[in-house]
């Protein structure tokens, strides 16, 4: 039996404020297998980002456990790559110096780390941009830099929290196709949060739908569309059927 990269077992999480108690997640269980691309959708406040924060060790669940590669680590920090919604590029550092941060944290010599990073620039469409600064980059290019920095952490599993949410439609479609090519080439495991149901279907092997707060698993749907994916699939009947089914689960009339 294949060991999951990530396994959530009966996860519950509640936040306590001065005047309110906010239940974020309730009894959430699912697995992500090696090489899978899993997208997560749900209404705002359904606990999607909380799930990622728990997975990377920024928060701890009130109930349940999270396994990484079949183990129960005491500390989950650094075991998976995590890219939050904002790119968090440091404006005073060049593109190359921004993506070298994971190597600096690990104490890897700069000459070695520069070589490893530069070898990946062409795969991420960043060749000839290594000496530019974030202020000179488009939104799509900034996301490529942020994703390369996450990639260079060297983890087999990546958590991407709405990485394309702030981009225009054309740039978003371009980066969807680019991400799929990189994912397939390097055989990573990806969990991807999005509010865009079409994007969720287009990218995924499997879509997980979270209910409104507190977030529970409302539906898991396998996406049996052929790979490699192409944008023309969006107009095909089976794609539309999958999108309408997910929108119905989210309570959206179509």
Regions found by a protein language model. Name each.
Residues 68, 209-210:
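Short hydrophobic beta-strand elements within the C-terminal catalytic ATPase subdomain
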Residues 203-209:
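Conserved catalytic segment of ABC-fold P-loop ATPases
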Residues 212-245:
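Conserved beta-strand-loop-alpha-helix hinge in the C-terminal portion
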Residues 3-198, 203:
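ABC family nucleotide-binding domain
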Residues 166-169, 243-254:
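Extended, non-globular alpha-helical segments
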Residues 14, 226-229, 252:
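Active-site/binding-pocket entry motifs
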């Amino acid at each position: 039996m294949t060991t999951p990269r990530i396994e959530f077992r009966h996860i519950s999480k509640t936040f306590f404020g001065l005047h309110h108690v906010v239940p974020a997640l309730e009894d959430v269980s699912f697995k992500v297998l090696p090489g899978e691309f899993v997208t997560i959708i749900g209404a705002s406040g359904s606990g999607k980002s909380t799930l990622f924060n728990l997975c990377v060790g920024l928060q701890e669940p009130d109930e349940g456990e999270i396994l990484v590669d079949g183990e129960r680590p005491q500390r989950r920090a650094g075991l998976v790559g995590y890219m939050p919604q904002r790119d968090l590029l440091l404006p005073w550092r060049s593109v190359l110096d921004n993506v070298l941060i994971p190597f600096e944290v690990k104490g890897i010599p700069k000459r070695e780390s520069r070589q490893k990073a530069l070898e990946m620039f062409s795969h991420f469409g960043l060749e000839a941009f290594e000496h530019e600064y974030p202020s000179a980059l488009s939104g799509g290019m900034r996301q490529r830099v942020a994703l390369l920095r996450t990639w260079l952490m060297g983890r087999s599993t990546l958590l991407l929290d709405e990485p394309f949410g702030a981009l225009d439609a054309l740039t978003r479609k371009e980066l969807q196709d680019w991400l799929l090519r990189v994912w397939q080439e390097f055989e990573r495991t990806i969990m991807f949060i999005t509010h865009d149901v079409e994007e969720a279907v287009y990218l995924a092997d499997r879509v997980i739908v979270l209910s409104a707060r507190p977030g529970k698993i409302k539906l898991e749907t396998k996406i049996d569309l052929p790979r490699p994916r192409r944008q023309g699939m969006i107009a095909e009947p089976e794609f539309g059927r999958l999108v309408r089914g997910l929108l119905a689960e989210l309570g959206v009339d179509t």
